[in-house]
Amino acid sequence: FLDFENDLNVSRTEFGLAIGIQMFLWGLTAPLFGLLADKFGGNKAVFLGFLVFGLGIFLLYNGPNTGIYFQLSLGLLVGTALGATAMSVPVSEVGKHFSNEKRTLATGIVTASASVGYFITPLFTKYSLIEFGWQNTLVYYLYFIVIGLIASIFLIPVKKSSSQDIQIDKNQTFIAAIKEAFTHKGYVLLVCGFFVCGFQIALVATHIPAY
């Protein structure tokens, strides 16, 4: 992303700050979008996420995109959108369609597919930046976002029969759900694992290319 530094006068520090805001909001908004998915349906939560994603990328491409606006588009909006469009909500929604016996396999396939995407996307982005520039690369991202936006419309709502073996407390509040989650050892270890992921993978992806 050295093109940002040259064309938008965005320093590496400002770019790193935007990615930091993005990662923070990704983690912060994922439970909120999960709440929306439980209340109103996963298709609506993912659709909203792609709308915010598209707005962030469009502003980065064609709107005010320097200074604080760079943090707003790449940091605030894209980070918020990732809370709905990354793995958490889709994995949860897919899992609701399967019984306990098949749920692990189904969610594993979704997670593995997302991991392949995480591997391919940086390679595609790097190639596109070199060959076509950052503006065209953002346009390509907008195309993918539109595809995701359309696909989210056809996300099938969960039928009661598909999730009948999932114990759900309809009266449980959001705060109570968070407290319950942190009493589960596996959940705590998973959260710690994502902290490690952020410190090494996000750090490498953000700063190493400059060198």
Stretch-by-stretch model annotation:
Residues 23-31, 118-119:
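Residue-level signature of mid-helix packing/kink "hotspots" within the transmembrane helices
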Residues 84-98:
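Intracellular juxtamembrane helix-capping segments at the cytosolic ends
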Residues 1, 185-211:
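Extracytoplasmic gate region of multi-pass secondary transporters
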Residues 67-85, 195:
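Hydrophobic core of transmembrane alpha-helices in multi-pass small-molecule transporters
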